[in-house]
């Protein structure tokens, strides 16, 4: 029983010490990461826009991040080119439909 109390006291001391030491660093790190996230959000590619040159730059949707979906387009000259756009994959659409339906039923 005494060992358990000593271990608990040691853990409480370590947690309080580490949290007091790192609060200022944590706040600065959080601020920098929030600023980076805002910058990333501004630069992401919206749904239905072309992502051929940046296949990992699609924005987030309601529940999931949009995926860059590519198709091969054949021109009248017979040339094949790849065209990509940001969109919601079918399995994500199904999940969003189920969640939306569940929200309507259960409030």
UniProtKB/Swiss-Prot annotation:
Location(s) in or outside the cell: Secreted
Cellular component, GO, one term: extracellular region
Pfam families: Toxin_35 (PF10530)
Entry keyword annotation includes Protease: no
InterPro entries found in the cross-reference section: Spider_toxin_CSTX_knottin, Spider_toxin_CSTX_Knottin_CS
Signal peptide: 1-20
Tissues expressed in: Expressed by the venom gland.
Chain residues in the propeptide: 21-41
Keywords: Disulfide bond, Knottin, Secreted, Signal, Toxin
The keyword Ion transport is annotated on this UniProt entry: no
Domain of life: Eukaryota
Database matches in PROSITE patterns: SPIDER_CSTX
Cysteines engaged in disulfide bonds, as pairs: 44-59, 51-68, 58-86, 70-84
GO molecular function: toxin activity
Domain notes: The presence of a 'disulfide through disulfide knot' structurally defines this protein as a knottin.
The family this protein is said to belong to: Belongs to the neurotoxin 19 (CSTX) family. 04 (U1-Lctx) subfamily.
Protein name: U1-lycotoxin-Ls1b
Lineage: Eukaryota, Metazoa, Ecdysozoa, Arthropoda, Chelicerata
């Amino acid at each position: 029983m005494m060992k358990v109390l000593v271990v608990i006291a040691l853990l409480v001391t370590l947690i309080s010490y580490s949290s007091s030491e790192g609060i200022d660093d944590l706040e600065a790190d959080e601020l920098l990461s929030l600023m980076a996230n805002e910058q990333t959000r501004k630069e992401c590619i919206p749904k239905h826009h072309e992502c051929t040159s940046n296949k990992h730059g699609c924005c987030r949707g309601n529940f999931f991040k949009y995926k860059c979906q590519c198709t091969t387009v054949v021109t009248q000259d017979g040339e094949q080119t790849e065209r990509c756009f940001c969109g919601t994959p079918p399995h994500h659409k199904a999940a969003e439909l189920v969640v939306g339906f569940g929200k309507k039923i259960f409030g």
